[in-house]
Amino acid sequence: MSIRRLTIFLLCTSAPLWLHAELIPDSVWTFHQPDAHHHVEQNEIWLSADRPGFGTGSEVLDRGFIQWETGFEAAHIPGLHLVTLPTTLFRFGVHKRVELRMEYSGVLAINDHPDSISMTTDEQFYVPSPLTIGAKILLWDHYGGSLNQKWIPRTALLLNIGAPLTPDIAKIMPVSGSADLLFEHEVMDWLSIGYDIGAHWTEWAPMPDIFASLGINFEPTDHLGLFIESYNTFDTDAMNIFTQKRYTHYDICLDFGLTYAVHPRVQLDAYAGFNLYNSESLLSGPKNYAFFGFGVTWLIWHPLTAKR
């Protein structure tokens, strides 16, 4: 495997998790979505974002809603700077319990030491990630239920499939896919707990990675949201590409951030994070990485847009 292909391999698989398209982030707080009979106040917050964070929220866009979520992210692995430009998610509500999703992220890699044996000789290069198509399906919603029902988490199923956009990516990751169960407890009006668990596949791996996240979301005001989250991957059948030996690989990571609604249909966000432990690097042992990013969510269209 060439050095360039090795670097692409790291960017698109188990080296940092924030590159997985399906891991695009959960909102730090949930907003009410109006139905056709709901009286709408001018300043009511309608959007429900899946960013920032790496777990995904269980709330589904209602029928007729169209939402765009995009952002910028910068990360550092020893010897390599990574800039995600952009990370973009489109969400389309097709039913009150089903939304369709399309996502793309492109990564600009910049070498600290182009002459290093662990890096390509290029000072920088762009890696297009797979185009991801998916659906989120609401399985259970406790909204409006009794107190006992509210202790049952709102639950959704997220399904994704990724298709490579370039021949270089296709050689090492022809097709990827994921299936995640998304759970959320609304403990109080200002506090919720979300947790996800799922399996993520790629063509090159005989066994899927297991992904798990746990996040706590705070809403101190109607406009401001805060979150802290742990997200982790576990691979019981990883392979060292140099020795061809199998081993168990896992990443334990932490991120935190905030959101601010500047308009009922526009939300800004900022976040940062790092890995607490990486069991093994495919290059030369455990390596830490850190990242930060910011973005915007825009509810482009909803059924009442024309009436406002």
What are these regions (language model features)?
Residues 22-308:
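Transmembrane beta-barrel domains of Gram-negative outer membranes and organellar outer membranes
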Residues 10-19:
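Hydrophobic h-region of N-terminal signal peptides that target proteins for export
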Residues 6, 15, 294-296:
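In a subset of proteins, long, contiguous C-terminal domains/tails are tracked
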Residues 8-10, 46:
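Hydrophobic residues within membrane-embedded alpha helices
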Residues 1-7:
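Bacterial N-terminal signal peptides that target proteins for export
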